[in-house]
Structure formats: C-alpha cells, structure tokens
C-alpha cells in the first residue's frame, strides 16, 4: 500500500506515528509506503519547524494539532481501503518521457523517465495509475495559498482519461532536479498538464504485463556525518559557527542554526549519524520489476547508478521522499565540492552549510576519500540498496 500526501515531507516522529497506526490495522510494515509530494506550498508540519522558521510563531499548538489530524486522516484512509470491496485487476508497466527537469547542481544527470504502473479492470480499462517524475515541485514559486504544484495538474489530466480513473504521484530522485522554469501557478499548471497528457496518452495501450506477488522489505540505514569528536576540532567548529552567527550577511535561518550548533559544540550534544528508512518491493513474477523507495531528498546520481545495474527504468523504479526526510542524500560527486545539496558552504567547508543547516545537522555527510578511509554516505547507501535488491 502506497499513501501519498501533498506536504513538504514527513519528519521521523510523525512518520512513526502514522506507520504505527497502519501496522495496528494489520498491514505489515514492509507493505506500507508513505510518500510526500514535496510541494513547497503545503501545510506546516512539526519537527523541523523550530527554531528555524518559527521566530514569532504563536500557534505551534495548532501546527501539532494539524499533524495529529493528518496522521489520523491517513490511518482512516488505509482503514477505509482495507474495508472496501476488492476488484479484479491486471497490472501493466511502461516508461514514458518528460523533459522539463534540469540538474540544478550542474551535473550531467537530468531526469526524463516517467515510470507508469496501471491497474486495469477485467474490461481492460484503466482503474488506477501510479506514476512518477524526478523534478522538485517548485514550479509555482512561493505562494500564500496551498498549491500542490505540477503533480496536481498532472493527476487531473490523467483522471480525465475516463470515469473512474484514479491517479497517484510519487516523487522521483529530485534532490538535484528542478523545473527549468519556475515562478507562477501558470508555469506549474503547464508542466503538470504536459506530464499528465504524456501519461494519459500512454495508458490507452497496455504496457508490459506485471505478474506475481510482491516481496517487500523495510530497513533503516545509518549514515555517517563528517564529524571529528576531539576537543581541538570541536573548538575549531564552535569558532566557525560563531563567525557565521556574527557575520552581517548571514541569512536568518543560518544564523540561528549557527547559534544552536555553537551551543551544541560546547555541550557535546549532537548526533554524528543520520538514520534513513529504505524500502524495496520486488514483483515475483517473470516481469522482473523492482521498486526502490528511499527516504530523504535523494539526488539523481543514485538512480543513475542503480538503473544502470538493473536494466534501466524498464526494470527498476527509483523514487525518493518516502517515509522520512531528514536531509538531502548527496553522492560523493557532490560532496567533493561545496553546494546546497552537499550541505557544504565554500567559506566554511568544515561545518554544516546549505541544506544541512536547514535540516538542523551539526556537520555535513562523510565522503570516502580513499580505499582505506571509512565508508561514507554513498558507500552505505549503495551497499544497503544493493543488498535489498539482490
């Protein structure tokens, strides 16, 4: 069962509350995937809120109340689904092409693949369509009203195929992928309409038949941060954070983060790892389709790596933003230089910067720099997913 919500992301605590409720309904943990569309114009959720965007916020209780309500709403949705009358369907799969994404980190990888899984009734007509694309849902820019961005318009187009068609979107490896144009609802609607039309035109004819059961796995991987816990290094880290906090040009959230991390260095109250959920579904029939759902804002290089070793998108569906989003998940290629996705600022490469400041971490992820060095984030991710796909 895959549940998708139009929110930026689920934090660890909220995800675990929802997962616990679903398990209590009789669903095996490995059979449940919770995904966020990652719209940047969705409702505020707790956990990553304080102290970075809540300087003058007085209704934090309302934020928590909404999160509690959302958790129950999603659990009720699962319960309703489980109690509903079953329908006989067949599954078929195909991959189509879209072209409005760009690699914002300047790498060569650009997401074009759109995996599409269709459930058809006994009459051959589509009943449900699951589809994905790897581009940040930021085409609409910053809006003051709720806006699900391009996935919503794509869903509208697909569901216009005919009565009774349900469409669902899951976000691909979009950590370093943005729409090539952003800034208005009109832009977002245009991209969504184009994506939806592409999928709608494709589902008129069945793709490759998917058979068999599903072998599901749910695991957690521990990813190392690049932190040397010695008195001398922590003193240097504290000094670097103090300089950032005092610099007149430091943006508000980065200044607040620096203040907090300076205190953490003094108190030695910081994590040295990030815990990330991973899921793999493997269809056990002859079709050979496998689906990967990673937590975090996974960058496209991981998808490129695993597709190349598993028969491309025709055999491997790779998605991110599943279950929990504790950070961007960069590759060694990104960690070798500064950048937002890497969580490294050029003026202070030894401390957390960019996205790692936003996500409230003490340092950026560890990069393996030699064959004898400890495994870094990329090696840990590759080993875990490879094992699960085997």
Q: Can you describe what each PLM-predicted range is?
A:
Residues 1-390:
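Non-catalytic substrate/cofactor recognition surfaces at enzyme active-site rims
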């Amino acid at each position: 069962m895959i549940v998708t919500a139009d929110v930026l992301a689920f934090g660890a605590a909220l995800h675990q509350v929802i997962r616990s409720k679903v398990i209590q309904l009789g669903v095996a943990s490995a059979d449940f995937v919770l995904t966020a569309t990652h719209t940047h114009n969705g409702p505020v959720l707790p956990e990553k809120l304080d102290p970075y965007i809540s300087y003058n916020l007085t209704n934090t209780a309302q934020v928590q109340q909404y999160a509690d309500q959302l958790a129950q709403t999603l659990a009720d949705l699962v319960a309703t689904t489980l109690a509903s009358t079953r329908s006989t369907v067949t599954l078929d799969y195909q991959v189509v092409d879209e072209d409005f994404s760009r690699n914002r980190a300047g790498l060569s990888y650009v997401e074009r693949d759109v995996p599409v899984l269709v459930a058809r009734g006994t009459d051959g007509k589509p009943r449900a369509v699951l589809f994905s694309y790897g581009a940040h849902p930021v085409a609409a820019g910053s809006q003051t009203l709720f806006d699900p961005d391009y996935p919503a318009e794509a869903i509208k187009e697909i569901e216009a195929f005919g009565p009774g068609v349900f469409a669902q979107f899951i976000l691909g490896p979009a950590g370093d992928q943005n729409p090539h144009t952003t800034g208005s609802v009109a832009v977002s609607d245009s991209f969504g309409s184009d994506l939806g039309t592409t999928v709608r035109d494709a589902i008129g004819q069945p793709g490759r038949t998917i058979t068999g059961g599903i072998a599901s796995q749910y695991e957690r991987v521990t990813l190392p941060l690049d932190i040397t816990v010695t008195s001398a290094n922590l003193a240097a880290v504290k000094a670097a954070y103090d300089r950032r906090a005092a610099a007149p040009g430091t943006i508000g959230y980065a200044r607040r983060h620096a203040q907090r991390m300076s205190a953490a260095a003094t108190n030695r109250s910081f994590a040295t790892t990030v815990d990330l959920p991973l899921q793999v579904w493997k269809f056990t029939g002859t079709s050979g389709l496998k689906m990967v759902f990673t937590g975090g804002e996974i960058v496209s290089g991981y998808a490129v790596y695993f597709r190349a070793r598993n028969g491309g998108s025709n055999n491997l569906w790779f998605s991110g933003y599943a279950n929990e989003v504790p950070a961007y998940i960069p590759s060694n290629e990104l960690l070798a230089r500064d950048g937002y996705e890497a969580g490294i600022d050029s003026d202070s490469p030894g401390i957390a910067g960019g996205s790692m400041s936003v996500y409230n971490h003490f340092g950026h992820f560890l990069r393996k720099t030699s064959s004898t060095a400890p495994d870094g984030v990329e090696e840990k991710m590759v080993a875990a997913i490879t094992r699960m796909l085997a």
